[in-house]
Amino acid sequence: MIQTFTNPLLLDFIKVCIKMPQDEREQLEAFTGEKFDIDGAAIGNFTAPGPKWVIKADDEPIMIGGFVPQRPGVWRDFALTTPEAWTDHWFAVTRISRRVMNAMFLSKQAHRLECIAHHSREKAFRWYKPLGYTREATLSGYCANGADAILFSRVDHGYR
């Protein structure tokens, strides 16, 4: 059974980070310039400001997502996942993520949601389309190691 909760525990973050796919670990390393560390990734995202949620399958966390405020009305997403989120629950994870994004707009908390991904994550880029993200720009040299990143956004043009 798939369930969503808006109050993920630190333990949920740790469990997801333990199982995190290699490409997500490499992205975190590229962004931070530090070797991937389960505790660091879990605690860093757990303590980030903004709304967070956890998706559980049979009471085990498979994905944690959230939005970190950048400025009023603008939020940057994050997602920590397990392989099972993609192999067994892709549709549910996508549907829930899209609904959470919609709620950010409907509540008027956001007029812009954005996502930044390492340039090599083509598989992830394909997932962003059903979420409503549009590829916006290449951020040259954005990563700590000098690699490029890609900026995606979803904008509510009716905001005001």
Predicted segments, located by residue:
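A short beta-loop-alpha structural element at the N-terminal edge
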Residues: 1-27
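Active-site rim helix/loop that mediates acceptor-substrate recognition in acyltransferases
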Residues: 30-50
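Conserved beta-hairpin
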Residues: 49-65
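A conserved beta-turn-beta hairpin within the catalytic core of GNAT-like acetyltransferases
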Residues: 69-79, 111, 148
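Conserved acetyl-CoA binding element of GNAT-fold acetyltransferases
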Residues: 72-93
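Conserved acetyl-CoA-binding loop-helix of GNAT-fold acetyltransferases
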Residues: 88-105, 126, 130
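Conserved beta-strand-loop-alpha-helix junction that forms the acyl-donor binding cleft
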Residues: 110-129, 142-143
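Conserved catalytic-core motifs of GNAT/GCN5-like acyltransferases
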Residues: 116, 134-149
